[in-house]
UniProtKB/Swiss-Prot annotation:
Belongs to the SecA family. HAMAP family: SecA. Gene3D superfamilies: Helical scaffold and wing domains of SecA, P-loop containing nucleotide triphosphate hydrolases, SecA, preprotein cross-linking domain. It is found in: Cell inner membrane; Cellular thylakoid membrane; Cytoplasm. The gene is secA. This is Protein translocase subunit SecA. ATP binds at Q90, G108, E109, G110, K111, T112, D509. Keywords: ATP-binding, Cell inner membrane, Cell membrane, Cytoplasm, Membrane, Nucleotide-binding, Protein transport, Thylakoid, Translocase, Translocation, Transport. Residues 537-556 are annotated as: Disordered.
């Protein structure tokens, strides 16, 4: 009723933005008359005015005042540099982002271009802007592509990549606009707060941040905290023994009910991702290991056995991890990408290494951690973009205080979403997927098939090979990751078939007919790598090969069952046409010129990529080599476009891109992301999901109803099932999972909120010390607090002064401050408690000045260095121990629910007490260390 009376709030909001859009449009003609240099001058004038205002409220008002002009400048720069003009709906998206909201824009509506508007405006404050993407590839692409606009206008653009050293990171963070992944930003923040010198700190104070694919980062990845670990020695033979034992144990066929153990040695709860030993299993393990108690603190085994069982049942090779260079490398469940350097904690990674007979790496201990929720809440200005935010609107608002606004599409959507096809068995489903893929391919339409794991993508690849359907595989396998740019460039070509693992998280648009710009870059890279790249750095882009199949039609039993076979990729010809001899000759001349300028095989692959990317820009350059490269790129692109424009028309006429989903995701939002790959910007397209009753979602969360359905449907595996009850079960299962994971994220957030307040206090103290701000006053403050604590511990105000334990008090003071060796009870016997505290504090200050004069004689400035060293040492050591204690507390506090106590409140109260104790110990240890500090002097100095 309220909605009917007041209208849709989203529509009301969009109407409010309309006058601003009209003002930007009004300024367009005026701004278009300016020369390139005048545009840059306008930027400098705006930056000088806005950055000079130190009052935050007034600065915000200035940003609002200059928004129309700033957006008009960016629009004009984009037209000149990218040949792309912001539509009115994209301007609305920019306004929404500037107001620190989430802009929901459908796939292909130009989210990446929209981000240039608020990023430019907020960069004018001079405080820096971060643009966050889900992976290195997208960060690099956006910095190269959209960075052209900002560089053209005179702003500096930085990029953070995984392999950068601290100096490179600092330089890039100091830029006006910096592109980075969420994990790189988070880990740099943690590393900065472990730095021992202010020069090691790479990040500036946070200002404004735009997150691309915001739901992927703030929702999907919010269950996993960022952790920096240090190594801890643990007995490796226990992991090996537990792995051997796990193979001897039998899995129970069902979970226990009403306290009765099922038959078997252990139960697997896939929903909770846990393995639990039965009574029979406990007995079997104790007998096998020759021990009487698996939980014996002197010789614990339970933790190792549980991890070994989880490695056996829940961590699957080529799904959760792959083996690369004799190491188990994690595969990101949301993006399908490998995450080298990341390891599971609590001994789980070691259990997987034992299972796969790999070298077992030392176990780790947490040194620093933070959740994505609390990390991104550190930004005063936070905004995000996604194609699907409304399904998680409540969580965005509750956790992050972020409103969501749906931005209208520029063109009407023409995509058709075909009804789901559900099969009784997984094999039936995969056969149907292969059949529909082959059919659409023969119609001349491109097909994108989304799979959930490396294993499944390779099964489908083998089925398509038997049908002689050429296709590309894009998954976490290293040989496929290297070809990502090539695969995406041609995924929209006529009849192209692309199998992608978790494509929904990749954030890459597929252009109908193929991407001529990418293809031109790849062509030049293919020619230049052998001539310009150092031999040890050489990674030539693989030349696509057509793979033949010995099979003659149909599906062999081998193809269906061989899920884990490592399959080579097939591909259509990458380049749309062969360049003629004159063209090849021209490219040969270019190669010779570049070798003269840049040296024979002197560059790394990344350096060559950078130069090709710079050449692809339209920004002005004085580098003749870049000019030559730019000219050649443009010529190759035009040649390819001549062919691809006809191919684009052909694909449009055939019906556009067809997207196939092979499993419902845990979240409806991710299903919608995958669907959104088709029908971008008003293109034609279609989508369909193929499901089976064996799929994880239905099997784990569907409950007994789905199990009964499986028995009820007496149909062939090749026959699709259509049932209203089944559709409802599917929707119900997805809602259950969304609620289940929301509760987990909420719990992670609530528990980390306790740690977050402590983290802020510790990191704030640490930063003051690193900057060397009032170090002496800080240490004296620690000492004064310690004197008060000693008096409170040894003097009981309820007792008369003659009964006070003055001797023990003096003894304790001397433990901390040996320079007060001549302190006697006669000096303080007649003092009141307050006078006693003041007297001891005064004596501490005198002793500290005396200590300082001794140390400074050895070398001026040494006392300040010692203060910084000891404070940082104590903070780091005690914080590390505190993190371990808090982890243990969190694990144990859950059991208090059985005693009618709220575990979270218990965690907050005990955690707070533990934190106060840690800070007290830190102060006392620093004071003790400072007075005991006796630097070694050079023998020659003494003489």
């Amino acid at each position: 009723m309220l909605k009917l009376l007041l209208g849709d709030p989203n529509t009301r909001k969009l109407k409010r933005y309309q006058p601003i859009v009209e003002e930007i449009n009004f300024l367009e003609e005026e701004i278009s008359q300016l020369t390139d240099d005048e545009l840059r001058k306008e930027t400098q004038n705006l930056k000088s005015t806005i950055s000079a205002e130190l009052d935050l409220k007034k600065q915000k008002e200035l940003l609002e005042e200059f928004l129309p002009k700033a957006f008009a400048i960016v629009r004009e720069a984009s037209k000149r540099v990218l040949d792309m003009r912001h539509f009115d709906v994209q301007l609305i998206g920019g306004i929404v982002l500037n107001e620190c909201q989430i802009a929901e824009m459908k796939t292909g509506e130009g989210k990446t271009l929209v981000a240039t508007l608020p990023c430019y405006l907020n960069a004018l404050t001079g405080k820096g802007v971060h643009v966050v993407t889900v992976n290195d590839y997208l960060a690099r692409r956006d910095a190269e592509w959209m960075g052209q606009v900002h560089r053209f206008l005179g702003l500096s653009v930085g990029l953070i990549q995984q392999d950068m050293n601290p100096l490179e990171r600092k330089k890039n963070y100091d830029c006006d606009i910096t592109y980075a992944t969420n994990s790189e930003l988070g880990f740099d923040y943690l590393r900065d707060n472990m730095a021992t010198d202010i020069n090691e700190v790479v990040q500036r104070k946070f200002n404004y941040c735009v997150i691309d694919e915001v739901d992927s980062i703030l929702i999907d990845e919010a269950r996993t905290p960022l952790i920096i670990s240090g190594q801890v020695e643990r007995p490796q033979e226990k992991y090996q023994k537990a792995a051997e034992l796990s193979l001897e144990l039998l899995k129970a066929k069902e979970l226990s009910k009403d306290g009765i153990d099922p038959e078997g040695d252990y139960e697997v709860d896939e929903k909770q991702r846990s393995c639990i030993l039965t009574d029979q299993g406990f007995a079997k393990c104790e007998e096998y290991l020759g021990v009487s108690d698996l939980y014996n603190p002197q010789d614990p085994w339970a933790h190792y056995i549980t991890n070994a069982l989880k490695a056996k049942e829940l961590f699957i090779k080529d799904v959760n991890y792959i083996i690369k260079n004799e190491e188990a490398v994690i595969v990101d469940e949301f993006t399908g990408r490998v995450m080298p350097g990341r390891r599971w904690s609590d001994g789980q990674h070691q259990a997987i290494e034992a299972k796969e007979s790999l070298k077992i790496q030392p176990e780790t201990q947490t040194l620093a951690s933070i959740t994505y929720q609390n990390f991104f809440l550190l930004y005063p200005g936070l905004a995000g973009m996604t194609g699907t935010a409304k399904t998680e609107e409540v969580e965005f608002e509750k956790t992050y205080k972020l409103e969501s606004t749906v931005i209208p599409t520029n063109q009407t959507r023409k995509r058709q979403d075909w009804s789901d096809q559900v099969f009784k068995t997984e094999i039936g489903k995969w056969k149907a997927v292969a059949k529909e893929t082959a059919q659409i391919h023969r119609e001349g339409r491109p097909v994108l098939v989304g799979t959930t794991s490396v294993e499944k993508s390779e099964l489908l690849s083998s089925l398509l090979s038997e049908e002689k359907i050429p296709h590309n595989l894009l998954n976490a396998k290293p040989e496929n990751v290297e070809r990502e740019a090539e695969i995406v460039a041609q995924a929209g070509r006529a009849g192209a078939v692309t199998i992608a693992t978790n494509m929904a998280g990749r954030g890459t648009d597929i252009i109908l007919g193929g991407n001529s710009d990418y293809m031109a870059r790849l062509k030049l890279k293919e020619i230049l790598v052998p001539l310009l790249v150092k031999p040890d750095n050489e990674h030539k882009p693989p030349i696509p090969k057509q793979r033949s199949s010995k099979s003659k039609g149909g599906f062999s039993k081998k193809a269906v069952t061989n899920l884990k076979k490592n399959i080579s990729n097939s591909s259509t010809s990458l380049f749309p046409c062969k360049l003629d001899e004159a063209f090849e000759k021209k490219l040969s001349v270019l190669s010779d010129e570049l070798v003269k300028s840049w040296g024979d095989r002197q560059l790394s692959v990344l350096e060559l990529d950078d130069r090709i990317a710079t050449a692809a820009e339209k920004a002005p350059t004085d580098d003749n080599s870049i000019k030559l490269l730019r000219e050649s790129l443009s010529d190759v692109k035009k040649e390819y476009e001549k062919v691809l424009i006809h191919e684009e028309e052909k694909v449009r006429e055939a019906g556009g891109l067809h997207v196939i989903g092979t499993e419902r995701h845990e979240s409806r939002r991710v299903d919608n992301q995958l669907r959104g790959r088709a029908g971008r910007q008003g293109d034609l397209g279609s989508t369909r999901f193929f499901l089976s009753l064996d799929d994880n979602l239905l099997r784990i969360f569907g409950g007994d109803r789905v199990a009964n359905l499986m028995n009820a449907f007496r149909v062939d595996e090749d026959m699709p099932i259509e049932s209203g009850m089944l559709t409802r079960s599917l929707e119900s299962a997805q809602k259950k999972v969304e609620t289940y994971y929301y509760d987990i994220r909420k719990q992670v957030f609530e528990y980390d909120e306790v740690m977050n307040n402590q983290r802020k206090a510790v990191y704030g103290e640490r930063l003051r010390v690193l900057k060397g701000i009032d170090l002496k006053r800080q240490v004296i403050g620690y000492g004064e607090r310690t004197m008060i604590e000693i008096v409170d511990a040894y003097i009981n105000p309820d007792l008369p002064p003659e009964e006070w334990n003055i001797d023990q008090l003096i003894s304790k003071v001397k433990e901390f401050i040996y320079l007060l060796d001549d302190l006697k009870s006669d000096d303080i016997n007649l003092l009141s408690i307050e006078e006693l505290k003041n007297y001891l504090q005064e004596q501490l200050r005198i002793a500290y000045d005396l200590k300082e004069s001794q140390i400074e004689k050895i070398r001026p400035g040494l006392m300040r260095e010692a203060e910084r060293f000891f404070i940082l040492q104590q903070i780091d050591n005690l914080w590390r121990e505190h993190l371990q204690s808090m982890d243990s507390l969190r694990e144990s506090v859950g059991l208090r629910g059985y005693g009618q106590k709220d575990p979270l409140i218990e965690y907050k109260n005990e955690g707070y007490d533990m934190f106060l104790e840690m800070m007290t110990n830190m102060r006392r240890n620093v004071i003790y260390s400072m007075f005991m500090f006796q630097p070694k002097t050079d023998v020659n100095e003494k003489n």
